[in-house]
Amino acid sequence: GDYNPGGRLAVTFPKSVGQVPFAFPFKPGSDSKGRVRVDGVLYPFGYGLSYTTFEYSALKISKPVIGPQENMTLSCIVKNTGKRAGDEVVQLYIRDDFSSVTTYDKVLRGFERIHLQPGEEQTISFTLTPQGLGLWDKNNQFTVEPGSFSIMIGASSQDIRLKGSFEVQ
């Protein structure tokens, strides 16, 4: 117990074999035989254990509205609220809320590993670029579509601590 591990999973572990493969974008619903798909996972992408706890706060979005070729900066504060020093991997996910093609529910667009002493806090910043917002449209062209995007910052793909949104014009 002298060392606090801070590793994170680089894959998702499904609850059942029937969920595999699920490495493609899909819309929720039933299968061809009318059975409803099992939702949820055993261990989500980015999951990890720690002997301490972390609190996320103060999400700041540099611009609520951006153009398709603009960068955006996001930041938040992470504080070690436990009694041990530890590493945290702060993960940034986005979602195109109304895309013209089916996309993933959320996509990892950045992560930052930090080491904090008990009671210490640190501001974490991420930069979103047009490349990170784009998708391949139905004409097989890479584009940044106008519309609303959701921002999710957390400790794993399911343990989302902060949420926000912005718009691309």
Name these PLM-found stretches.
Residues 1-87, 93, 113, 118, ...:
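Secreted, periplasmic, or luminal enzymes acting at the cell surface/secretory milieu
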Residues 32-37, 42, 92, 102-104, ...:
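Alpha-helical context
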Residues 83-100, 106-108:
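Short acidic, flexible loop segments centered on an aromatic residue
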Residues 95, 129-131, 154-156:
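Short, loop-centered acidic/histidine patches that primarily coordinate divalent metals
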Residues 132-148:
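Short glycine/proline/serine/threonine-rich loop/turn segments at secondary-structure transition edges
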Residues 164-166:
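C-terminal edge beta-strand
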